[in-house]
């Protein structure tokens, strides 16, 4: 049945989502989570009819009765169809119990249940339940847990329908709510302009922290070891043009590491370049990291007060790296500044805010807060401490929040100056106490209605994380490229090039980019001279790219990190070998062709008929092997009777993944019981055929 979202219905009725949610709860007894929740289209039509005739009380009363009858009927139909039961309001508890009593053959179980508990609910002897499980090929002891699907199949044997317990259904609701939590409210009436979040990047000692220090009119630099930033700090600065939130990072590595975790919190990057030093290796890396993240760059040409300052030389070098200054006909804003004399600072802030204005940054301060973790740490006296950026909504002391896979209730909140505050709006950095564990930089946070909800959502997040780790997406590699890299409908191969001399870098970049075709786009994300470092691996991981090295090797730390992050590093001595490998990988990116490969044969020697399972074939493997995952053919007198899949494969009573030549096995075929002695079971699989370029 078609569904209607609450916010769509509220628009049709000319009411706010919140007002409609209250009406549904108070007048109809329908509980919905938020504006993204859905109800049946039939129910929506009835609600529209009732609200349009709200002046006629008698009519309204009749309609409510009719509506309640239809809801009751709907619930019964859903139960008959084994649709999972939704969370009910406490007021409907008695009504639910009466409905349960109407179904003698319906039981309610959780996502997992022990064999003993299932037998109790079915009111059957444990031995009978275990027997049915054995017929299904599941060997489970009395206290062993089985999943919902298996429980349903066992219950069906006893003519009992199974529905999932409300708590489990509620968890799925929570999961759905969690996934929708980042969607913005359709009603933009309460949205306001928010301050931009700016990250300051640049080469070491080019004056990043000094510049920010000058803007904030405070003294941070002196407190940090060696004058180099030791942590990720976030600061809000008030200017005449408005507020700006600055992230002072320990370099672009942190920026990219957070981007690799899906954290897109930076609106604008201020790239600091020393006027007397020009573009340096870390400056070049920072430029490439920003381009990979599609973040606009404002260049601050610092130290213009120094005798050796040469602004035009810096602009020339920027042009060589694709950043053409506005006064040279490009679109990159370049502002000469001096952190020491404070010259040009107002202009830098003005240009940054102007860049942000073009992006039309807005947020809704009235909604529940959400945002991103900048850093997390464990304080001996205060417990887990997290620095956050609020990206939407307003965060308040006492809010229950989920942060990544941890949760908690905010006990205290501090601003960037260490002052205790009670609330924080969009783009405001804060430090909070009250989490159950230390979150990681880049984790998303969300405010939820209570701590119980946060705890449940954290459990769901942990489950999802565990599942994602088990079936994690592999990083791109030359060996398996076609299924890994896609940019919309255009396939893309990202490459980071490192070489021993600059001439090799440029030659390799040009050669690789010429390999681009309509099917595959080759993009060199970053190219530089020197050994392959951890920074290269971090960028490759975040951009899902491969690293190609010419006459250079990865250092030990880079190799270890690449293995951990599953980043593919290839080193060569000859450029043509690399080009051939890239061509081969691009061929692999095209849709593969498959051929059939027979992996084994088995002869059916005995037939066993089991009422609850069907026909079990006792076989002897005559060649190759039979695997549980392979496709099979049943061949009788040289004629193929069936092509299908195995339902089970066993050695004695144990499930087997494969059975080799010379061994006996028992097997059943999915949806096929007409097996006869003397039949041949042929196992085969489809393998990819290497394509010619």
UniProtKB/Swiss-Prot annotation:
CDD domains: IF2_eIF5B, IF2_mtIF2_II, mtIF2_IVc. Residues 78-102 are annotated as: Disordered. SUPFAM superfamilies: Initiation factor IF2/eIF5b, domain 3, P-loop containing nucleoside triphosphate hydrolases, Translation proteins. It holds the Pfam family EF-G_D2. It is found in: Cytoplasm. The keyword GTP-binding applies. One of its GO terms (molecular function) is GTP binding. GTP binds at residues 202-209, 248-252, 302-305. Residues 227-231 are annotated as: G2. Coiled coil: none annotated. Residues 302-305 are annotated as: G4. This is Translation initiation factor IF-2. The gene is infB.
């Amino acid at each position: 049945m078609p569904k209607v979202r609450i916010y769509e219905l509220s628009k049709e009725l000319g009411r706010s989502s919140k007002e409609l949610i209250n009406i549904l709860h108070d007048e109809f007894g329908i509980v919905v989570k938020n504006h993204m929740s859905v109800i049946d289209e039939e129910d929506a039509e009835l609600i529209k009819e009732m609200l349009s005739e709200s002046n006629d009380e008698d009519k309204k009363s009749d309609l409510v009765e009719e509506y309640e009858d239809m809801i009751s009927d709907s619930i019964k139909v859903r139960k008959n169809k084994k649709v999972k039961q939704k969370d009910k309001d406490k007021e409907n508890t008695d009504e639910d119990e009466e409905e349960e009593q109407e179904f003698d053959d319906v039981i309610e179980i959780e996502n997992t249940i022990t064999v003993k508990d299932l037998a109790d609910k079915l009111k059957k002897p444990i031995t009978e339940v275990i027997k049915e499980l054995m017929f299904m090929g599941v060997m489970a002891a009395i206290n062993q847990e089985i999943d919902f699907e298996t429980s349903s199949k066992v219950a069906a044997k006893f003519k009992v329908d199974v529905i999932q317990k409300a708590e489990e259904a509620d968890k799925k609701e929570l999961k759905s709510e969690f996934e929708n939590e980042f969607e913005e409210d359709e009603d933009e009436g309460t949205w306001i302009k928010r301050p931009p979040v700016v990250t300051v990047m640049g080469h070491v000692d080019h004056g990043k922290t000094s510049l920010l220090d000058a803007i904030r009119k405070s003294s941070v630099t002196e407190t940090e070891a060696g004058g180099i930033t030791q942590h990720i700090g976030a600061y809000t600065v008030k200017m005449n043009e408005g507020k700006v939130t600055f992230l002072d990072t320990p370099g672009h590595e942190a920026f990219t590491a957070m981007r690799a975790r899906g954290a897109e919190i930076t609106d604008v990057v201020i790239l600091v370049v020393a006027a007397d030093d020009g573009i340096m290796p870390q400056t070049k890396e920072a430029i490439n990291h920003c381009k990979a993240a599609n973040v606009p760059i404002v260049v601050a040409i610092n130290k213009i007060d120094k005798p050796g300052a040469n602004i035009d030389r810096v602009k020339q070098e920027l042009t060589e790296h694709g950043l053409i200054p506005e006064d040279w006909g490009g679109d990159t804003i370049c502002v000469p500044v001096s952190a020491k004399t404070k010259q040009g600072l107002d202009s830098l802030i003005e240009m940054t805010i102007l860049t942000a204005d073009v992006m039309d940054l807005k947020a809704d301060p009235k909604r529940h807060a959400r945002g991103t973790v900048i850093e997390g740490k464990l304080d001996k006296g205060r417990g887990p401490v997290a620095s956050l950026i609020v990206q939407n909504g307003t965060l308040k002391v006492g809010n229950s929040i989920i942060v990544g896979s941890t949760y908690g209730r905010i006990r205290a909140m501090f601003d960037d100056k260490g002052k205790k505050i009670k609330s924080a709006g969009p783009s405001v950095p804060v430090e909070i106490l009250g989490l159950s564990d230390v979150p990681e930089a880049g984790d998303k946070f969300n405010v939820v209605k209570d701590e119980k909800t946060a705890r449940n959502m954290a459990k769901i997040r942990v489950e999802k994380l565990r599942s994602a780790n088990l079936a994690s997406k592999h990083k791109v590699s030359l060996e398996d490229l076609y299924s890994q890299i896609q940019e919309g409908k255009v396939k893309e191969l990202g490459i980071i090039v490192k070489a021993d001399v600059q001439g090799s870098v440029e030659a390799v970049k040009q050669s690789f980019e010429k390999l681009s075709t309509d099917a595959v786009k080759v993009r060199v994300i970053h190219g530089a001279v020197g050994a392959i470092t951890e920074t290269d691996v971090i960028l490759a991981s975040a951009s899902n790219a491969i690293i190609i090295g010419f006459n250079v090797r990865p250092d030990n730390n880079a190799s270890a990190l690449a293995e951990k992050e599953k980043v593919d590093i290839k080193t060569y001595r000859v450029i043509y070998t690399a080009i051939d490998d890239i061509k081969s990988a691009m061929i692999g990116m095209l849709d593969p062709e498959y051929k059939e490969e027979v992996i084994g044969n088995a002869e059916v020697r005995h037939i066993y008929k089991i009422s609850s399972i069907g026909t079990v074939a006792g076989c002897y493997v005559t060649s190759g092997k039979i695997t549980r995952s392979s496709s099979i053919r049943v061949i009788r007198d040289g004629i193929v009777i069936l092509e299908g899949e195995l339902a089970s494969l066993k050695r004695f009573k144990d499930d087997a993944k494969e059975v080799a030549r010379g061994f006996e096995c028992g097997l059943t075929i999915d949806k096929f019981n007409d097996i006869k002695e003397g039949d041949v079971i042929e196992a085969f699989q489809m393998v990819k055929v290497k394509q010619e370029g």
